[in-house]
């Protein structure tokens, strides 16, 4: 056992309690959190339930005692007789009242006090999402903080002999691990630890008064804003209908809400056995259901409408209702099937367990490389994410779920992980007897790792194991991997699952194919925490409950009778004659396989499954019982052919929860409902607005990012007294939409517009866009922010915010504005606007010499996606930067305004600073590059990156920095500590979204808040209702960002495929970003993509990694062209993908000749049809970056080869790969897949010159 494990084990024996200062987690975070220990995975949950049950019984007894005492006192007062013995007793014993959370009377006044927990919504309870605690719960309660060891039952659901940790002890262990790293000379992160002893004066001799679980609320604690008695009645969305309803906006039934199908007494629970449900009436309707009477159209608005608010993940129940989960049934459930997962803890108990520090709440993020593993982000409660090892510990949680996690000793989890990976290797070895073993510290799932033996104090890439199911293990037993015979002499047969040649790993073929999809289907590589034997996770845990799941989620994918892993061995895995299950493979790799009952599949699917192999379907998950390895779901609709461009776009929208049917007329689904029209403004409502319509006085120009709709306008005026006036005007959309109306509810449901190169999904109906868009000479109602600036310094002297009307003189698209600004001779008017924007930017990053370009476009995209989409995600024009900087200033001004007046109710936007461990890793990487700038503050970090002169290096470092940062989030001020309001990437202390109400619903909320401030009227919205809205807007905004990125990737793949249509691949220059022992990452600037070059895809003899100097040496087979090379294990047609057919037909020399010839003749590589398509979309065709050799006598291929660093030692042909080096690579697109992929290879520099 490792040193860490011994430390933790010794610590569990200590009699004294230990406390660690919390790092965040909400406005009511605890000062100290106790620790508990256990010996098996299920023991603590049993103890919890027993304690809660006993505590409630104790509270009932105390309440009865209190009533009896009160009756005795009343009787004594009436009779005038006092019993001296009773009097003395009464002076020393005052029974505790029942905790309001457990009152049987749901209408008790105590339910609205500090102890109340709203059950009408999700992700709005600070006890869940912000890990909120009562500061006084533990400070005077040492009995509850003591260590406990009980005789545990056998661990039937998980791993035996693992210790559980309270939040406090987990932080202590993490701090010790960090301290050891620092003492060893490694860059790390310090964790603040406070050793606090429990107050001895609070100790009691009686267990009844000493232990209170959960503790009673402190009568003297401060007012809690989240649960104030002043709050209005609970929020209901949509509101009750008043009068006639002119639309068919119908709430979705619970059978279509994933979060409503769990633990619901009216439907099969998530823990239920699906086989036992066959006798129940079928509640799941599907368009493919083979019962005509129940057929429904799942494309209708009524059916697919996700709920307007988040719904509670589990139905509220008394805590005793889940005791059956831990009954004496052993390994079997009530139906006799083996339980594969642990049942969830009852929802009613979890808030108090979180308050006690026994559980932590957070958002689960699936490890895309190994989908059974995951990480949980705790929103600041911990200084690092929690590692979840294996599907059992993940316990059926999905990407984006809000989960409750019990922390475990890291060493125990890590040892278990290593044992499982070794077991996996042995099982794979039964089918692969000629392979060389990996070192025990190697990562089975990642050939980009750096082991302790070769890393020389460098962090490795993530590793994780899959302790999954019998089915998954059987799949891995059947994996086979053969390698190039040219290097067989280098190794000897052993018992292992992955072959190694020096530092070069050989992945199984199925793993290669999986990596192609994981790495190839995104623009940038997705990285997780860097962990290995030397740098273990700081925290580990297992999921004990899913608190909330985003409702109404849909997934696109393909349908088959066999699992994808079985299809590779289809000869030996023929489907049964009458299969009961079809397998739905989601396009999103983070979503598990979904079992679809064949009766819900197309009618002829079983007989003609091959006919549907190229079809895309939409499915949803309905349940996931503890007895099943996979979730069960239903098919919602058939999208169409997998190669159809329209189907591809629809698939992206469905995967990201945009159905685009909110405004459609049910009578004519091809059109929007004609009754959706903006409310007209009366003359009286316009009178009190400030008037900016005089075109002689105000030269207002509107900005149209897309060229046809405008919501933002500017004017600049010289006041003549040494000041300038900058007016910023935003369309007053909410004046035209009644709050709570049908349009308002539908806009809230859509929440965000989606901007893709191929398609636009607006937030509002088209009639609103046409009517409300700013236009020259058209008077429009706006909300304005007017700054008075000093003419010389451009500092703000005063600010006016209010309602207004404007009449723009002109309208400019971003392209037109950029053209005027980039000509070098813009008008003085536009020059003034540009200089004001530069001044705002310089002050924002605290750099007086700052210029608008270059900009950190990736960091800025963490807050908001682009409206004018480019094919390269890194592209930013000067016009875009100028307008965006002014908008940021307006947004921050409005944020200050509403927060000053509304306080806790203000809807704001923040971005948390990166997790300390991720920032330490980033700092280590840039130090390896030779850069060492300050990373302690956002402004210094931004300035440090911007000062890098080399564009490729600067962008490369920005990519690495981008991966350390979370996306910005909406929040309600009263739910977050004020010191966490800041927006890190923008370096602003307070921020919100205000300037885009025609594409973001969050701006509608801010507009209404601002109007309440302007008119000095009470803002009556409930804080909990605002919390629901903010969380839903966060979810849909992230979906909109992902949809945009996937659509860009789709079009980029199409473009690259077209450019390389003649040769199958492109040859271009790339910059090396990171080097590992078996692979390296490259960045291709002209396409804005980052990809990984795998050593086992190249004709290499071996590879050697120098961890000290960060150099990877590739030992090439001379004369073998990597452009036409196919590894031996991929030559079997059944072992690889059809998408690479004809991709290796041209040699590297032919590719180089064609590219350089076309460049010399100024001929485009792209075809005319695609060139026209991109031109119509206002997109620029990428230009390949080709080498420029001074020696004109070199042929085309030699020009590329001359950029490499090579040497020949004896018979070894070696290429050196350094970080930040520019090397030639081969790029290809694979478009015959549900989502196309981009893959890269390195060019072999040791080929015959032709």
UniProtKB/Swiss-Prot annotation:
Residues 1-32, 79-163, 197-338, 418-443, 455-517 are annotated as: Disordered. GO terms for biological process: cell division; intracellular mRNA localization; mRNA catabolic process; negative regulation of translation; regulation of fungal-type cell wall organization; regulation of G1 to G0 transition. The modification Phosphoserine is found at residues 40, 164, 183, 286, 322, 491-492. Residues 582-657 form the CSD2 domain. Residues 497-510 have a biased composition (Basic residues). Pfam families: Dis3l2_C_term (PF17877), OB_Dis3 (PF17849), RNB (PF00773). SUPFAM superfamilies: Nucleic acid-binding proteins (SSF50249). Residues 694-1015 form the RNB domain. The modification Phosphotyrosine is found at residue 688. Gene3D superfamilies: 2.40.50.690, 2.40.50.700, Nucleic acid-binding proteins (2.40.50.140). PROSITE patterns: RIBONUCLEASE_II (PS01175). GO terms for cellular component: cellular bud; cellular bud neck; cytoplasm; cytoplasmic stress granule; nucleus; P-body. Residues 124-145, 277-287 have a biased composition (Low complexity). GO terms for molecular function: 3'-5'-RNA exonuclease activity; mRNA 3'-UTR binding; mRNA 5'-UTR binding; mRNA binding; mRNA regulatory element binding translation repressor activity. This is Protein SSD1. It comes from Saccharomyces cerevisiae (strain ATCC 204508 / S288c). The lineage of its organism: Eukaryota, Fungi, Dikarya, Ascomycota, Saccharomycotina. The gene is SSD1.
